[in-house]
Each structure stands twice: as structure tokens, then as C-alpha cells.
Regions:
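Hydrophobic/small/kink-forming positions within alpha-helical transmembrane segments
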Residues: 56-60, 90, 145, 149, ...
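Hydrophobic transmembrane-helix bundles of small-molecule transporters
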Residues: 138, 160-272, 276-279, 305, ...
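Helix-loop-helix hairpins in multi-pass membrane proteins, especially solute transporters
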Residues: 62-200
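Hydrophobic transmembrane architecture of multi-pass small-molecule transporters
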Residues: 395, 399-493, 499-500
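Membrane-helix interface/capping residues of multi-pass secondary transporters
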Residues: 44, 74, 98, 130, ...
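12-transmembrane solute porter fold
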Residues: 8-24, 29-33, 40, 44-53, ...
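Hydrophobic/aromatic positions within or immediately flanking transmembrane alpha-helices
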Residues: 12, 48, 74-79, 101-102, ...
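A residue-level signal for alpha-helical anchor/packing sites in multi-pass solute transporters
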Residues: 122, 126, 157, 185, ...
């Protein structure tokens, strides 16, 4: 079956569908959180656990993917995971209180976590020729973009017109189609015999990633390590990671196979997928809030801007396979450079920017991400042995997810902390003794002799301080893209052939 082109195309379509439905579940729920909060009589802090626990379950289950595939095979694991994902998705839509929803969201994350790494491993094993593999990665990458891009808009419409429950119901037809595709077209892989699961390593790593994810997700809300709970989680994180590290060094059967990291391109690929995770998701978190709250864009304009970013990614996926034939490192460098330029330009935004200007910056940023992803996927797995592919793709996506989580948390910290500094500095300038405030233009904007004028000036100072905070985060974003470029020289252009 794997030797003929037509079945391989079907495999690619099925795996793209599997990937899209899981990634849609990650983004579609966000738009319905306010409505869910009211319907389930939850506080903002309580409803935030709907997202947090799903991310924790995903982080814990992802490293287990390789062992699951080795023990039961990719077909069985896919069937179980897609089935479990479909059932928990349906159950999420039927709850009447918060507690069962949290339980089902944990199940949704745990069943969904292996889907993306297994899908990538199946495609990589089906398309072994470098040129065809590049095209396949491009097509699969489009499912990563199109699904999560459409889902929030469709989910928001369904939640507004009907109920928040429809954000889960709309996933069911797609997940059932994915299950039928897996049952009909995915065959068993020839993976090596599984060794006994290293429970010490798995439990230690699970505790570490759980603590880390909760710290990242709730740290800013709880004032980081000033909070006793966050401090305790940090201590547990360090201890459990130390235990995992020592177990990996001295165990005869470590949970994460050390052979993975003897592959030079794979190890470098992990570094660059961390960078990709940093750069790909962060703008979709920062831009909507900034544009809506401090520039005054309506939801429709923000949706258009995000759609244009998806267009840029789509164009990158079209171009990257051709450029990668010349040298994948050049394509990656061009992608990082485009992302860096978009960050530099974003750092010039102000409250008067037009939708057109922000849109073309989004296209450039999306183009860079598209140019980076395909060659990154190619060089990372070019020499990895087939029996390590499931472990490799699982670790690959775990690192990508943590790149996103860490950089988002860092950028939010930069925005909030520098906004306070900016507010203090601007407030010092805006005082009755500043001669600039006595000029005619200033008097027209802010009448300091009235309470309304003082309130208006204070609000303007706050808005400008936060805006400068966002600009600082865009500078950090640009540096995150440009600084790693020289390290691309360490990647082998034509690595030796891998051995099974």
C-alpha cells in the first residue's frame, strides 16, 4: 500500500484531517469561554482551568506517544485516540456544571495529544523521497493552519447564534470522518518490539511538565513566585526534572531514548522547532488584544488580519518545497529573516495604523513561518531511524508547544511590567509644570482645569504606556527570529542516509 502514489495521497488526506480536528479543538473553545462562564456559573479564574487542564493533559500524554505506538502500533493507537477524542468532545458538550467539563477536557487533551506526532510520523514514513516529502509536509502543514484558522470564527458564530455547546458539536462530524479514514486506510507499522515502560522516568517527567505548564499558564495571574502555590510548584518541578534527568542517565531502559539525541540534525531541529513555536503562535495572542483594546479595531477587522496571516503561511508552504531543493538552510534563514523584519515593523505600530498596514505585516510574518516549517521538518527527521520516528515526532511537538507557552508567558510579562514603567515615566512628564501642556494643541485635547480633562489625560497615559509595552514585546519577537540565524550553518545540508 505504501508503494503506490494514490494510497499515499489518501493517507496524507486522512492524517491532515486527524491533525486539523485536534488543533481545531485547541482554538475553538477560547471564543466560547465567556458564554461558558455564565452558563456554568463559574468565576473567571475557575473557567480558565478549562484551558489549563487541557494543556496539562496534552503535555503529559505527548511524550508517551512513542511507547504507545511501539507497544500497540500506530493504527490501534490512532483508532483509540480518535475514538476517545470524539467521545470526550461529545461529553464536553453535554455537561451542566464545571467539574465534569474539566474532567472531559483532560480526557480530550490526553486522547488528542498523540494525534499530531503520529500523523507526522505516518506521513514521513510514507513519503521517504526528499522532494515528495517536502510537498507532503506542505500539504499537511496547510491543515495545521486552515483548521485552527477557520474554527474560532465558525465556533464564535455557532456559540452566538445557538449555544457554547456547538463549539464542541461542530467538531464531531470531522472527528468521525477522521476515524472512518483511519479504519479504512491506515495500516499497521513495522515498529520495533516495545521495551518495558520506565515508570519512574515517565512519572517524573509527567510531574515536571504538569508543574511547568501550570506555572506558565497561571504565573502572571498569581504574581509568579510571590505566590506560595507557584513557588511550591517550582520546587516540585526542579526536583522531578532532576529525578527524570538522573533516571535517563543511569537507567538501562530510559523513558526518552538517548539515541534520539545522537542524531545531529534531530538535536538541532529541536532547538529550531522551539524557536518556531516561539514565533508562530505569539502574534495571534498579542495582536488581537492590542488592536481591539488600544487601536479600536472591531472583531471583523481583526479576523481579516489573522486571515491574511494565514494567507502568508499558505504562500510559504507553496514556495518552501521548491526552495528546499536548493538548500533547506537557505529557506529556513529566509523564513527567520522575514519573521524578524515583521517584528521590527510591528515595533513601529501606533494607535493610528491602518488595517492594510497591519495586514501586510501579517502576510510577511505568516510567509516566514511557512518558509521555516517545511525545511525544518525535513532536516530534523532526515537521518532519524524509522523505529525512532514516533518518539522523535512526539518530542518534536512537545518542544514546539513549550516554545509557544514559554515565549507567550515571557511576552505577556514584558507587556505588563514595561507598561508599569512606561506609565510612571509618562506620568512624570504630564504635570502642571510641563510647559508643553500649556500649548494650544494640548489645551484642545486635554483641559487640565476640569475633572473630565484630567481623567482623559490619565486614560491616554495608560493606553500609551500599554502600547509601548506591546512594542517592546515586538522587539523581543524580532530578536528571537534574527539571533538564531547563524546557527543554521551547523545543520548538515546533505546528511548521510539513515539506517533502520
Amino acid at each position: 500500500m505504501d508503494d503506490r502514489d494514490v494510497p499515499r495521497v489518501i493517507i496524507l488526506v486522512v492524517m491532515s484531517l486527524v491533525t486539523a480536528v485536534y488543533l481545531c479543538a485547541l482554538t475553538v473553545v477560547n471564543v466560547a469561554l465567556p458564554q461558558m462562564q455564565g452558563a456554568l456559573s463559574a468565576t473567571p479564574d475557575q473557567i480558565s482551568w478549562v484551558i489549563t487542564l487541557n494543556l496539562v493533559a496534552t503535555a503529559v500524554a505527548t511524550p508517551l506517544t512513542g511507547w504507545l505506538v511501539a507497544k500497540w502500533g500506530q493504527r490501534k493507537v490512532l483508532i483509540w485516540c480518535v475514538s476517545g477524542f470524539s467521545i470526550t468532545t461529545y461529553l464536553c458538550a453535554t455537561v451542566s456544571s464545571l467539574e465534569p467539563l474539566l474532567i472531559y477536557r483532560i480526557g480530550q487533551g490526553a486522547f488528542g495529544a498523540p494525534l499530531v506526532p503520529i500523523a507526522q510520523a505516518v506521513i514521513l514514513n510514507a513519503y521517504k523521497e526528499p522532494d515528495k516529502r517536502a510537498v507532503a509536509m506542505g500539504i499537511w502543514g496547510m491543515s495545521v493552519v486552515i483548521g485552527p484558522g477557520i474554527a474560532p470564527a465558525l465556533g464564535g458564530y455557532m456559540a452566538e447564534e445557538y449555544s457554547w455547546r456547538w463549539t464542541f458539536y461542530l467538531l464531531l462530524p470531522v472527528s468521525l470522518a477522521a476515524l472512518i479514514g483511519v479504519l479504512a486506510f491506515i495500516r499497521e507499522s513495522n515498529d520495533a518490539k516495545v521495551s518495558k515502560l520506565n515508570w519512574t522516568g515517565f512519572i517524573a517527567l509527567s510531574i515536571a511538565v504538569t508543574c511547568f505548564q501550570i506555572i506558565l499558564d497561571r504565573g502572571e495571574r498569581l504574581d509568579w513566585f510571590e505566590n506560595t502555590g507557584i513557588l511550591v510548584l517550582g520546587i516540585v518541578l526542579l526536583f522531578s526534572f532532576y529525578l527524570f534527568f538522573m533516571n535517563s542517565l543511569y537507567s538501562k531502559n530510559p523513558f526518552i531514548k538517548p539515541q534520539l539525541f545522537t542524531d545531529r540534525n534531530f538535536s538541532l531541529g529541536l532547538f529550531f522547532v522551539f524557536i518556531y513555536g516561539m514565533l508562530n503562535v505569539t502574534p495571534t495572542v498579542l495582536l488581537p488584544t492590542m488592536l481591539q483594546d488600544y487601536v479600536g479595531y472591531p472583531d471583523s477587522d481583526i479576523g481579516f488580519i489573522l486571515a491574511m496571516r494565514s494567507v502568508g503561511i499558505f504562500l510559504g508552504f507553496l514556495v518552501a518545497p521548491r526552495l528546499s531543493k536548493i538548500d533547506p538552510r537557505y529557506c529556513m534563514a529566509l523564513g527567520l529573516f522575514a519573521i524578524g523584519i515583521s517584528g521590527i515593523v510591528s515595533a513601529t505600530f501606533n494607535s493610528q495604523i491602518t488595517v492594510f498596514f497591519v495586514s501586510w505585516v501579517g502576510v510577511l510574518q505568516g510567509l516566514g513561518c511557512g518558509l521555516l516549517w517545511i525545511p525544518l521538518s525535513l532536516v530534523t527527521f532526515a537521518t532519524l531511524r524509522e523505529n525512532l520516528m514516533a518518539d522523535g515526532t512526539a518530542f518534536f511537538h512537545l518542544i514546539r508547544n513549550y516554545g509557544s507557552s514559554i515565549f507567550i508567558a515571557l511576552n505577556v510579562l514584558v507587556v505588563l511590567r514595561t507598561s508599569k514603567i512606561n506609565n510612571s515615566e509618562l506620568s512624570e512628564i504630564a504635570n502642571p509644570y510641563n510647559e508643553r501642556l500649556t500649548l494650544p494643541d494640548a489645551q484642545t485635547s486635554f483641559n487640565l482645569d476640569t475633572t473630565e480633562g484630567l481623567i482623559s489625560l490619565a486614560q491616554e497615559i495608560t493606553d500609551q504606556a500599554v502600547m509601548i509595552g506591546y512594542l517592546n514585546s515586538f522587539i523581543l519577537y524580532a530578536l528571537g527570529a534574527i539571533i538564531p540565524i547563524p546557527l543554521l550553518a551547523l545543520i548538515r545540508k546533505n546528511p548521510p542516509s539513515k539506517k533502520s
